[in-house]
Design a protein with these regions (language model features):
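Extracytoplasmic gate region of multi-pass secondary transporters
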Residues: 86-148, 170-195, 263, 297-298
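Flexible cytoplasmic inter-helical loops of multi-pass small-molecule transporters
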Residues: 38, 54-78, 348-358
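C-terminal transmembrane helical hairpin of 12-TM major facilitator-type secondary transporters
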Residues: 163-178, 183, 189-194, 212-266
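Symmetry-related core transmembrane helices of the 12-TM Major Facilitator Superfamily/SLC fold
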Residues: 34-53, 321-340
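Interfacial helix-cap and linker-helix signal at transmembrane-aqueous boundaries
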Residues: 19-28, 113-114, 205-207, 301-310
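A late C-terminal transmembrane helix in Major Facilitator Superfamily
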Residues: 276-310
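Helix-to-loop junctions at the C-terminal end of transmembrane segments
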Residues: 148-155, 198-211, 305
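Glycine-rich segments within core transmembrane alpha-helices of 12-TM secondary carriers
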Residues: 1-24, 287-298
Length: 359
């Protein structure tokens, strides 16, 4: 269930990635305010849905009688049980390290691609230069998401693999359109799509086979490999219009796989670390710690980028090697914590490697 929820969340990320540049350029004059307005509209819709959910939850509590159950109420002192748990702190720190290597990177990724890829704008009169192509790409993106998402819930093998095949074909088509548009933002927008496709699959695997801690380790390894590829391999292909984009797409898709592995295994592990009545508090503390990293590391990336490019005035000529190595080092720290978590899990019998569903 959590894997499916996160897959839909990744679709939201992809929507913002593909439509933000579209709205910014709408009308022929670039204006960030239109993209911001688009985000505000989405937030208003989310607020309405949250209010509806609140009342639905209240109604459910009144029907089941859970609202009146106070046998074991929450106490502030219960937070001490969370803060003194070694497993919780390992997961919280792993979370802040991993997400700090992902979300701040998204802020700079498009410019990084512009600096390392040889992109030639299509002719102004060609199909690929028209704003309507964005709509076509988004429809294909929805096909990737819908077919891949639906394939996870099919019991018939033919239908399951047919939908999966359709999703993969649509994904390849989307990548081809990004190449033809010669647009860095269109190329990077593929990042969340593989996560939409495989996160429910990983969630199902976690439910039936376990291995959450191992998935955290694997996700960290992929993260390190991707950032180092962006830092050292991609610049080697600058001037190679096809080779550079192939390397970029491959690395972005692998990073998307990492972005599926870690969240799909990290968030369902929290209930195994803390008491049921403090799960909400545990998640809140983790998000609080995570947001510290999401505030700090974009600033650090900017400082490092400025320090390593002192005389560069053209934004398409920045050298991103140092910031990418810094992000890879966060992945190394997350990897170490992943191995520590496996040791703690084995020592304390937390059950992170065990399946959620036992028959």
């Amino acid at each position: 269930a959590m894997g499916s929820e996160m897959a839909l969340a990744r679709l939201g990320v992809a929507t913002c990635m593909i439509f933000s540049p579209f709205f910014a350029r709408l009308g022929g004059q670039v204006s960030v305010s239109r993209s911001v307005a688009f985000g505000v509209v989405l937030m208003c819709i989310a607020l309405i849905m949250t209010i509806v959910y609140f009342f639905m939850d209240q109604k459910l509590d009144s029907q089941t009688g859970e609202a009146e159950e106070k046998d074991d109420p929450f106490k502030i002192s219960d937070l001490g049980k969370i803060l003194t748990d070694a497993g919780f702190w390992i997961v919280a720190l792993l979370c802040v390290l991993y997400y700090s290597a992902i979300f701040p990177f998204q802020k700079y990724a498009v410019n990084m691609l512009q600096c390392n890829l040889t992109l030639t704008a299509p002719d102004a009169n060609s199909f690929w230069a028209q704003p309507d192509v964005t709509i076509v790409q988004y429809v294909i993106m929805l096909i990737v998401a819908a077919a891949g998402f639906a394939s996870n819930f099919q019991k018939k093998a033919n239908l399951k693999y047919g939908l999966l095949g359709l999703s993969i074909v649509a994904l390849v088509t989307y990548c081809y359109m990004g190449y033809m548009r010669q647009s860095a933002e269109s190329i990077f927008a593929v990042f969340p799509l593989l996560a939409v496709l495989i996160t429910p699959i990983l969630g199902s695997y976690l439910d039936h086979h376990g291995k959450a801690a191992s998935m955290l380790v694997l996700g960290s390894v992929l993260l390190i490999a991707c950032h180092l590829t962006f830092a050292f391999v991609l610049p080697m292909f600058k001037g190679n219009a096809v080779g550079g984009i192939i390397i970029a797409y491959t690395t972005i898709l692998v990073l998307g796989a990492s972005f599926s592995l870690v969240p799909a295994s990290l968030w369902p592990s929290v209930p195994k670390l803390v008491d049921a009545k403090v799960i909400g508090s545990a998640y809140a503390l983790i998000f609080w710690i995570q947001n510290i990293g999401l505030w700090l590391f974009p600033l650090l990336i900017g400082k490092v980028l400025d320090a390593t490019n002192p005389n560069v005035t053209d934004p398409t000529q920045f050298d991103y090697t140092a910031p990418l190595v810094m992000l890879a080092s966060l992945g190394v720290a997350a990897l170490i914590l992943g191995f520590v978590l496996k040791v703690v899990d084995k020592k304390k019998g937390i059950g992170l490697e065990l399946p959620n569903i036992t028959e």
